[in-house]
Amino acid sequence: MSDTAIHNEKKLLEMFGVYSWFQALHEDDRRLVIGTSRAESVSHDAWLARRGEPSDHWFGVHNGLLKLAIYDESGKSCTFSGVPPGGWFGEGSVIKRERRKYDVVAIQPSLVLSVPAETFETLLSSSLSFSHFVIGQLNERMGEFIASIQNQRLLRADARVAQSLAQLFNPKLYPSTDLALDISQEELGYLTGLSRQRVNRALQALQQQEILIQAYSKIRILDLEQLRVYGLSPI
């Protein structure tokens, strides 16, 4: 769980104010969000939420990087998605009031915004713009999960790395992500299920094809369209 929590309304207003869905709310709904939500600092490798727990919050990554995954008793994991800054997740489980179906772990030290389920449901019923935003989220997330399963089962390692990176640049789910992403080879390994050494070889191959450039704990994308289709032709 989180190490610290921020409830200061002025700070929360600054954080929530950068998101389009919040900007589109009426003033009363904005006050409800600020008055009931919090920001949580989550350290590297810490758990924000666990599978099987009640889905009592809708989450947004203000900065850092989270992964959504399932772990078994031996520690093996299956990663569904990484969530970079600007990404919101968990709306499906909150709407259905079901227990969370995946674990949420911080790959990087992260600042996460938490909106209570009751507030989320109020916004759904009172704000047409918010309802449209959530529907878009659900559609995009479903496509992302299907692609993740396809990638893990059908793609070779180089293509898995490329597609895991490409998912972090979905403009509808992650509008805050620019073409320079702060992520290390080890962190990308957490998302792909590959070793750091294998990720390194894949990134070198992508760099040789001028799709990206590597720097220390940073990757700059040179050709996003090529990254998105890399390795998909055999499918």
Q: Model segments located where?
A:
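Cyclic-nucleotide recognition modules
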Residues: 79-139, 143
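Long cytosolic regulatory regions associated with cyclic-nucleotide signaling
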Residues: 1-12, 92, 141, 160, ...
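Cyclic nucleotide-binding regulatory domains
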Residues: 21, 46-108
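Short aromatic/basic micro-patch
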Residues: 58, 82, 114, 182, ...
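Cyclic nucleotide-binding regulatory module and flanking cytosolic helices
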Residues: 1-44, 93-94
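Phosphate-/nucleic-acid-contacting segments
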Residues: 168-235
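Polybasic "coupling" helices that flank or enter modular domains
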Residues: 107, 125-193, 209
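A generic structural signal for short hydrophobic patches within well-formed alpha-helices
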Residues: 30, 120-121, 227
